[in-house]
Design a protein with these regions (language model features):
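Positively charged, low-complexity intrinsically disordered leader regions
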Residues: 1-10
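Active-site-proximal loop->helix
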Residues: 3, 21-67, 133, 150-156
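Gly/Ser/Thr-rich loops at beta-strand to alpha-helix junctions
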Residues: 16-24, 44-45, 94, 120-131, ...
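Structural beta-sheet core signal
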Residues: 39, 120, 142, 201-203
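Small/polar-residue-rich loop-to-helix segments that shape phosphate-bearing ligand pockets
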Residues: 43-112, 155-179
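Internal active-site segments that recognize and position negatively charged phosphoryl groups
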Residues: 101-112, 117-129
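Active-site/ligand-binding loops adjacent to catalytic centers
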Residues: 137-195, 216-235
Length: 235
């Protein structure tokens, strides 16, 4: 984020699904560094807790009815082109993020025995590919929880697809550490079913705090092809 400040970035645009920690993290960081944040969000009758928390932390929401998050990603890119905002792709698939992640993993394990096997969930694949760069001799297991995996996203990880829909809770939720019950917990469940006792598990985040804003007061519903939130920007 400091690099973006140094580049003179005044506004970032990203996407925020109903569940996802990247938008929450960006909302907090943009607040800290006095950068405006715009988040393209899928239309719904009522925003989710994660989306509400982003708005509470200062993010400007733009709503559109979409079939899948790549459609929101396209709108975010168009918004950036029209407004000169700094576009960050879905999944934080950005060189600064990947480089920072590689350094964090490398530094953490440089004086430790490297894991033989590392489990994580996968959506866009940025996390597992980042760990694969930092830990080239580790075997990776990736549990898909949210979307169809595209070519190149998996890296060299062994692929698993969780047997329940994205918004459903995991069959097993960790009891000894905080873990989001419909996301990372699904990776934990499969580690316990198919992994070994010495396997490592990377959890993206614990449960986010509950937002304080009144969710029903946010007008988030849009019909198909209703892009009124974007018209003022020439989209």
């Amino acid at each position: 984020m400091k690099q973006l400040v140094g580049l003179g970035v005044k506004e970032i645009v990203y996407v925020q699904p109903r569940r996802g920690f990247a938008g929450i993290s960006l909302s907090w960081l943009c607040n800290k560094y006095s950068i405006d944040l715009t988040l393209v969000m899928p239309s719904s009758k009522e925003i989710s807790d994660h989306q509400a928390l982003c708005i509470e932390l200062g993010a400007k929401p733009l709503f559109a009815r979409i079939a899948a998050m790549p459609n929101a990603n396209r709108l975010a890119r168009l918004y950036a082109e029209k407004t000169n905002a700094y576009f960050v792709p879905l999944g934080l698939n950005h060189p600064f993020v990947i480089a920072g992640g590689v350094k964090c993993f490398y530094d953490f394990f440089k004086d430790k025995e490297k894991p033989k096997t590392m489990w994580s969930v996968i959506s866009t694949g940025v996390l597992t590919r980042t760990m694969q760069i930092a830990l080239p001799d580790t075997n990776f297991k990736a549990v898909a929880v949210a979307r169809n995996i595209q070519q190149g996203e998996l890296g060299v990880a062994e692929f698993y697809s969780y047997h329940k829909p994205f918004n459903s809770k995991s069959d097993l939720v960790p009891s000894d550490f905080d873990c989001e019950d419909s996301y990372d917990s699904k990776g934990w469940d499969y580690l316990n079913k198919y992994g070994n006792k010495d396997d490592w598990f990377f959890s993206v985040a614990g449960n986010a705090r509950k937002p304080n804003i009144e969710k029903k007061l946010v007008n988030s519903y849009r019909d198909w092809n209703d892009l009124k939130d974007f018209k003022q920007y020439g989209i």
